[in-house]
């Protein structure tokens, strides 16, 4: 079967890989001159199923108000009055209660845990290298309240069967030696030993080459103008003067998926702007061993081979990708505070990207009302974490095979009034069926 995939970020490329492995004739189209040139290019580098959780959480509305007056706030909102922004924010607010949070988190952890297994299998099968580490992640607390509140996260981890360890400030250096010098600034941490790290851009570029060798065709520097519809299916993709036809079509367009699908399929995907710094390492012993997440500022600091990636924050500002100096100051402040001698900040590369976020935090993977149109989008800040699982899941669905995890509540159908999952996965049973 001929399959066209729109988008060559990590989600689009993993989709292409798994579909090609099923024997399909796959073509990937992207407006950029190569894979992973937008959102996948500069993310924080964490593969963190244990921290998979929606931004829509109890207490976030009040925190958002407080953050409006803080210089280094993790979330910023700039209202533009657009119906897309206002509708998305309203939908997000409706998901900020405990019951919605638990349902959404269970979906996200289910897919993220499965995705990590898929990545491990892919790595074993191909030997792909992407400066990956399997050193776990460490969430850092700066206040006693944060340390005490970890009990709530631990309860969720227990239900999900995710291994963890709660560390005192003095114990942090046992997993991140460079933190010994700043332990007095911290109250403790939550470590998830099974989480991983890696350069998402490098992974995507190398997997794209492997996919090309497996027969996938990549068409770069080509804008996608419109999806053409005949009856109840897609008839082709309009790219300038050309119409590209296939038997099935996959939209992996990230934050731009909503506009492309307008009038065809309604999806609540909105751009959540994030930032990162990439810093050359000058003293390996003073740099992170793996990755940490500063709970106060929601900023991750990750070790690659000879670089430190510092990423995080969220801005609800539409499709604005301009670099904000104040955000760079925040990133620099956090890395200087925790790893002051690890790298040369004066040589850092500053980046911003638009994460495709749904109001419930869960990506949209699966079928649509148009019988040959499929979606793989809306992964928010967890595209790297969920990419392999989403790609394999989509390949199973297109292949007509039962997926390895419960998947009906990951599709766009969940936004339909009266939707009820065919299979309810309780929080304590969200691991892959293997």
UniProtKB/Swiss-Prot annotation:
Cofactor dependency: FAD
Pathway: Amino-acid degradation; D-alanine degradation; NH(3) and pyruvate from D-alanine: step 1/1
Sections of the chain in a coiled coil: none
Pfam hit, one: DAO
Catalytic activity: a D-alpha-amino acid + A + H2O = a 2-oxocarboxylate + AH2 + NH4(+)
Group of enzyme by EC: oxidoreductase
Domain of life: Bacteria
GO CC terms: cytoplasm; plasma membrane
Positions of disulphide bridges: none
InterPro entries: DadA (IPR023080), FAD-dep_OxRdtase (IPR006076), FAD/NAD-bd_sf (IPR036188)
Catalytic activity, EC: 1.4.99.-
Keywords noted in UniProt: FAD, Flavoprotein, Oxidoreductase
Regions that span the bilayer: none
Binding residues for FAD: 3-17
Gene Ontology biological process terms from the UniProt entry: D-alanine catabolic process
GO molecular function annotation: D-amino-acid dehydrogenase activity
Role played: Oxidative deamination of D-amino acids.
Family under the similarity heading: Belongs to the DadA oxidoreductase family.
Protein name: D-amino acid dehydrogenase
Organism this protein belongs to: Yersinia pseudotuberculosis serotype O:1b (strain IP 31758)
Classification lineage: Bacteria, Pseudomonadati, Pseudomonadota, Gammaproteobacteria, Enterobacterales
Encoding gene, per UniProt annotation: dadA
């Amino acid at each position: 079967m001929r399959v066209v995939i729109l988008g060559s970020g990590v989600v689009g490329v993993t989709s292409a890989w798994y579909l090609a492995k099923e024997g399909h004739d796959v073509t990937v189209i992207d407006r950029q001159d190569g894979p992973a040139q937008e959102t996948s290019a500069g993310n924080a580098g964490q593969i963190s199923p244990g921290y998979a959780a929606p931004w829509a959480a109890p207490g976030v509305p009040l925190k958002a108000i407080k953050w409006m007056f803080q210089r280094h706030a993790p979330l910023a909102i700039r209202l533009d009055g657009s119906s897309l922004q206002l509708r998305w924010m309203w939908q997000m607010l409706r998901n900020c209660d405990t019951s919605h949070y638990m349902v959404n988190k269970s979906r996200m952890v289910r897919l993220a845990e499965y995705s990590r297994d898929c990545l491990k299998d892919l790595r074993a099968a191909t030997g792909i290298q992407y400066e990956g580490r399997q050193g776990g992640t460490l969430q850092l607390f700066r206040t006693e309240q944060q340390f005490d509140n970890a009990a709530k996260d631990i309860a969720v981890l227990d239900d999900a069967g995710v291994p963890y360890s709660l560390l005192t400030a003095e114990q942090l250096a046992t997993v991140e030696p460079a933190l010994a010098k700043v332990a007095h600034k911290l109250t403790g941490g939550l470590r998830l030993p099974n989480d991983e790290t890696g350069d998402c851009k490098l992974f995507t570029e190398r997997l794209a080459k492997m996919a090309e060798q497996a027969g996938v065709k990549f068409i770069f520097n080509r804008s996608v103008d419109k999806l053409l519809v005949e009856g109840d299916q897609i008839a082709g993709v309009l790219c300038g003067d050309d119409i590209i036809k296939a038997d099935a079509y996959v939209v992996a367009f990230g934050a731009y998926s909503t506009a492309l699908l307008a009038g065809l399929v309604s999806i609540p995907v909105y751009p959540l702007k994030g930032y990162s710094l990439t810093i050359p390492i000058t003293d390996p012993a003073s740099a992170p061993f793996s990755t940490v997440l500063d709970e106060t500022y929601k900023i991750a600091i990750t070790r690659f081979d000879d670089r430190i990636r510092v990423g995080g924050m969220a801005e609800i500002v539409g499709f604005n990708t301009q670099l904000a100096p104040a955000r760079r100051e925040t990133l620099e402040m956090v890395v200087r505070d925790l790893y002051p001698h690890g790298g040369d900040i004066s040589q850092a590369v500053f980046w911003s990207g638009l994460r495709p976020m749904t109001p419930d935090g869960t990506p949209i993977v699966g079928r649509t009302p148009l019988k040959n149109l499929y979606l793989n989008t809306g992964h928010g800040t967890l595209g790297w974490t969920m990419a392999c699982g989403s790609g394999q899941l989509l390949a199973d669905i297109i292949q007509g095979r039962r997926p390895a995890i419960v998947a009906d509540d990951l599709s766009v159908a969940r936004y339909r009034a009266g939707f009820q999952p065919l299979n309810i996965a309780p929080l304590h049973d969200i691991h892959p069926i293997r």
